[in-house]
Swiss-Prot record:
Species whose genome carries this gene: Oleidesulfovibrio alaskensis (strain ATCC BAA-1058 / DSM 17464 / G20) (Desulfovibrio alaskensis)
Protein's recorded name: Alanine--tRNA ligase
Family label: Belongs to the class-II aminoacyl-tRNA synthetase family.
Keyword set includes Ligase: yes
Entry binding sites for Zn(2+): 571, 575, 673, 677
PROSITE patterns per the UniProt record, alphabetical: AA_TRNA_LIGASE_II_ALA
First-tier enzyme category under EC: ligase
Main localization, broad class: cytoplasm
Length: 880
């Protein structure tokens, strides 16, 4: 039997031998494509090439692309585990031509691979083509030898592909395999008539040959392209002669492992058990790959999809008897089985397991409470002969207990109920609207639109700041505060200035924009910030201090040297810190965000738990070691692929052009970075971590200072240390020991004070019996014990109860603005009074509440002035 791993290997090798570049799978997070939540097809990483916006060194490529389809038009989540073909995560095998070969070679390659490499029987293969694609039909007949009776013409819905309403598009051909009459859905089963599994589509060949205009007209592309896709899971099932993708070797290892954990059997127990095992197998793959690609559980965007998958898989595990944390084990099984083909799984193995386990434990705390609420709702609906779970109930389950809507749907549907999804969505939208109303925006969308308009007008600027802090330039655009173009900015006016070239670094990559001055023949302005809306546009935020600035005039731009150097120092230390964290904590550490300014640096990174003091010190020492080694930095421009092969770290979520700048500290760090840096690490001087904290699940944050800022902070803390040493009458080097000694002395004194207080209270207690009164035939002792703590109060009450064999006792101790109260009732009076019943009304008089057993109750209050009123209330209750 041919394995899925072998199919993947054969596919890539086949196309490599036919002149294709084997390109690694891109991340599940699309690079610089806001239209996509996840990479969902092989062509996504080549989209800019197809659009003519990017060129690469090769014109033929082949990949095995990681894909995820959850949400949007590809929302198959409810079908996953219940059908033979639906998945969240899958691999797409594909070959691509960028203006190189076209239909004839694409058809030849595909037919050769499936009939010669995979040895699928030709007589069982059928082809669908676009209804007007006469060329494709002739080629399938002449190149592949497919007879006309096995070629079907279908419409645009089935056999025409487009990237969107406009842009590259073209007809496609699909290869189908006949799996046998026993797979038919009925007597009318056939290609183009149904979607059953008898005639199963296994490969789609897209011939991008047109450019579609907004009005729908199509013109031929000058360089037609090829984009093909074949699902690995599907072709593996076909080659292994199994009827379901879940029965191929890609899934069986996970299904069998989970079945063993749960003590159940696949295909032998119930269909519900089989569904649960398939869901867990599918979701475990998606979860492992998502975390390996830097996605972490959260309540929005990609992170929420991950959280949904973890929680959905976890609930299905509970349905087959799994308890505690178990999903992290199935995710580790994914690493074991697929880490060879995808090394990122191995690199993030431990981190991934910890993230999943923490999320499991978090959900487990609320799962039972949420299920109880839903069960109560379903019971109430049954009693009312209703079958729809209200939207507000579904929303409460989501908002309070963390139940994704699909989990509520799963449970409700299984019991014969539906869910008011419209009501749920309305409440979700109201919540989002409230959040938006609470946020005061800054007009970022207006800025972005205006800057995009400048780019479309051909306005661009060149950055020369790596080598110069001052440059002569020409003003090519001026905008007022309202973002409208102006010919001049007068004194006192604020606005935006764009020049042909500039030494000012625009905010990007976490580094803040430069500040400085702009001086022309007619005026001068302070540059308060520099923006970088795109790689080709740098915008100075200015405030004119004297005269006026005019469009199309010469201008001298000068960066503030001190601030630039301070920012460069912090940026270089950010790179050193990143490397140090990976060395101390492990290779799972990845940058999750940063802020680099002249005064400090902030670095967010993936790590599941708080750093220990020892780890923080180790990181600090490592950074300072690199600084004191005074290593010269290197920076060079090269192709992105070459940089990655060189070991440069591409930071998660960052956009990179085809040519990138690589900043390296030899022997320590290599990163893709466009920021400004020191010439050598020694210029940083020193490094000091000021805080380490958590900012999200699995994300930690370090804040630090460098150079003189670090020295000043050290000197300040040293002065404070000397001051503390003086206060505790010790030396700076002995402070820890001296403080421990003082703490021990304080504990001893506290115990002595408690003992004295207890003795005093006990003495007071012995005298209290003289204060016993009688109310309505019942003995009552109501007394206050000044200076007694709770422990002493209890000891006195025990003494009083031993002496007052029948009666009620109420003792009160006041500690500042806090009031402690105890009420005891002897057993023979329980038919008339109980301690909890008495204390409920009495404690209200001291601004508190309490409870307890029939014989003893306690309360706390905040109104010492109400003590006598409380005693009077007790007498009144007993006398009634």
């Amino acid at each position: 039997m041919i394995t899925a791993n072998e199919i993947r290997h054969r596919f890539l090798e086949f196309f490599r031998k036919n002149g294709h570049e084997v390109v690694d799978s891109s991340s599940l997070v699309p690079n610089d494509d806001p239209t996509l939540l996840f990479t969902n097809a092989g062509m996504v990483q080549f989209k800019k090439i197809f659009l003519g916006q990017e060129k690469r060194a090769y014109s033929r490529a082949t990949t095995s692309q990681k894909c995820l389809r959850v949400g949007g038009k590809h929302n198959d989540l409810e079908n996953v585990g219940r059908t033979a073909r639906h998945h969240t995560f899958f691999e797409m095998l594909g070959n691509f031509s960028f203006g190189d070969y076209f239909k004839e070679d694409a058809i030849r390659f595909a037919w050769s691979f499936i009939t010669e490499e995979l040895k699928l029987p030709k007589e069982k293969l059928y082809i669908t083509i676009y209804r007007d694609d006469d060329e494709a039909e002739k080629l399938w007949q002449s190149v592949a030898g497919v007879p006309s009776e096995r070629i079907y013409r279908l419409g645009e819905k089935d056999n025409f592909w487009s990237m969107g309403d406009t842009g590259p598009c073209g007809p496609c051909s699909e290869i189908h395999i006949d799996q046998g009459a026993d797979m038919a859905c009925g007597p009318d089963c056939g290609i183009g008539k149904c979607d059953c599994d008898r005639f199963l589509e296994i490969w789609n060949l897209v011939f991008m040959q047109y450019d579609q205009a907004p009005d729908g007209t199509r013109t031929p592309l000058p360089n037609p392209c090829i984009d093909t896709g074949m699902g690995l899971e599907r072709i593996a099932a076909v080659c292994q002669n199994v009827r379901s993708n879940f029965d191929c070797d890609l899934f069986q290892a996970f299904i069998n492992y989970t079945a063993e954990l749960a003590g159940v059997s696949y295909r032998k127990d119930s269909e519900d058990t089989d569904t649960a095992l398939r869901v867990i197998a599918d979701h475990s793959r998606a979860i492992a790959f998502m975390i390996a690609d830097g996605i972490l559980p959260s309540n929005e965007g990609r992170g929420y999809v991950l959280r949904r998958l973890i929680r959905r898989a976890y609930r299905f595990g509970r349905l087959i008897g799994l308890e505690g944390s178990y999903l992290y084990k199935t995710a580790l099984k994914v690493v074991e089985e697929m880490g060879g083909a995808f090394p990122e799984l191995l690199e993030n193995k431990d981190f991934m397991a910890r993230v999943v386990r923490e999320e499991e434990e978090r959900f487990n705390k609320t799962l039972d409470k949420g299920l109880l609420l839903l069960e109560d709702e379903l019971s109430a609906l049954t009693a009312r002969n209703s079958t729809c779970v209200a939207g507000d109930v579904a929303f409460k389950l989501y908002d309070t207990f963390g139940f994704p809507l699909d989990i509520v749907n799963d449970i409700a549907e299984k019991r014969g109920f539906s869910v008011d999804e419209d009501g749920f969505k309305k409440l979700m939208q109201e919540q989002k609207s409230r959040a938006k109303a609470a946020w005061k925006g800054g007009g970022e969308q207006t800025l972005a639109a205006r800057f995009q308009a400048l780019l479309e007008e051909g306005i661009a600027s060149e950055f020369v700041g790596y080598d110069h802090l001052s440059a002569e330039s020409r003003i090519i655009a001026l905008l007022g505060e309202d973002m409208e173009s102006v010919e001049a900015l007068p004194a006192g006016a604020a606005g935006y200035l764009v020049s042909t070239r500039t030494p000012f670094y625009g905010e990007s990559g976490g580094q803040l924009g430069d500040t400085g001055d702009a001086v022309s023949e007619t005026g001068s302005a302070e540059v308060t910030d520099t923006l970088k809306p795109s790689a080709k546009l740098l915008v100075h935020v200015v405030k004119v201090s004297q005269g006026e600035l005019l469009r199309d005039q010469a201008v001298t731009l000068t960066v503030r040297e001190g601030q630039r150097f301070a920012s460069a120092r912090n940026h270089t230390c950010t790179h050193i810190l990143h490397a140090a964290l990976r060395k101390v904590l492990g290779d799972h550490v990845k940058q999750a965000g940063s802020l680099v300014g002249p005064e400090r640096l902030r670095f967010d990174f993936t790590h599941i738990s708080a750093m220990t003091p020892e780890e923080i010190l180790a990181v600090e020492n490592e950074v300072n070691r690199v600084i004191l080694s005074d290593i010269a930095l290197n920076s060079e421009h090269m192709a992105y692929d070459d940089a990655v092969q060189k070991g440069a770290m591409a930071l998660f979520g960052e956009k990179y052009e085809s040519e990138v700048r690589v900043v390296s500290i030899p022997g320590e760090s290599v990163e893709l970075c466009g920021g400004t840096h020191l010439r050598a690490t020694g210029q940083a001087g020193s490094f000091y971590i000021t805080s380490e904290s958590g900012v999200a699940a699995g994300v930690r944050r370090i804040e630090a200072v460098t150079g003189w800022d670090a020295v000043r902070l050290f000197m300040q803390q040293r002065a404070e240390l000397h001051e503390v040493a003086g206060l505790v009458k010790g030396k700076p080097g002995d402070i820890a020991g001296r403080v421990k000694t003082l703490q021990k002395e304080v504990r001893t004194l506290k115990k002595d004070m408690e003992k004295l207080a207890a003795q005093a209270a006990s003495g007071k207690g012995r005298n209290l019996m003289d204060s016993v009164e009688e109310v309505n035939g019942v003995k009552l002792l109501a007394a206050s014990l000044p200076g007694a703590n709770v422990k002493a109060l209890r000891e006195v009450m025990d003494d009083v109860r031993s002496k007052l064999t029948s009666g009620v006792a109420c003792l009160v101790a006041v500690d500042g603005d806090k009031v402690h109260m105890l009420i005891a009732v002897s057993k023979d009076l329980h038919d008339r009074f109980t301690a909890p019943a008495l204390i409920k009304d009495v404690a209200a008089r001291i601004g508190g509440s309490g409870g307890g057993r029939p014989d003893m109750a306690q309360a706390g209050g905040t109104d010492p002035q109400g003590v006598e009123d409380a005693f009077a209330c007790l007498r009144q209750i007993m006398g009634a």
